[in-house]
C-alpha cells in the first residue's frame, strides 16, 4: 500500500513538472517563461527559459511584419547571431537563423554562408498586428555562425521588427540591450 502512494506521488510530481515545461506552440501560457525583458515601451517583449542544454525564447511584438533577436554583436549589427521569425497566416510560419557580417548587414541565413540552421523548433501566431514567435536552440550549437548563449551573467542582444514579412526588409524599430540572463534588462 505504501508503494502505491509513493508511485502516485511520483506521478503527481512528474505531471506537475511537465506543466511548467516550455511548449513551442506560438501561444504563451502563464508561467511558461520565468524571464522577461521589455523594449520599445512594451511593443516588443522577449521571454526566455533554460532547460538542460537548450534555450527557449518567445518574442511578442506589435508589428505587421517580421520579428528578430540578435546575440552578441561586436558593433551595431556586425558579427551578430540572429533569429528571424516571419509569422503570416495560420500555418505559414518561418524561422531564419542568420549572421550579420557588417555593421548594418547584410544578414544572410547561416545555411547560405556554410553554416547550419540551428533552430530546433519554432512556432508562431498572429492576431492582427500582434505576433507571438517562439523558438528553441542549443545553448552551444557548435556552428561558427552562432554565439554561445550563457545561462547567467550579462548578454548583449539586439532586437528589431519589420514593416512586412519580407526577410530582407529594413526594420521599422530596433534597439539593443544588455540582458541579465537570470532574468530582466
Positions of predicted regions on the chain:
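Extracellular-facing/secreted segment signature in eukaryotic proteins
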Residues: 20-185
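Sec-dependent N-terminal signal peptides
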Residues: 5-14
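C-terminal segment of classical bacterial N-terminal signal peptides
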Residues: 13-21
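N-terminal secretory signal peptides that target proteins for export/translocation
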Residues: 1-2
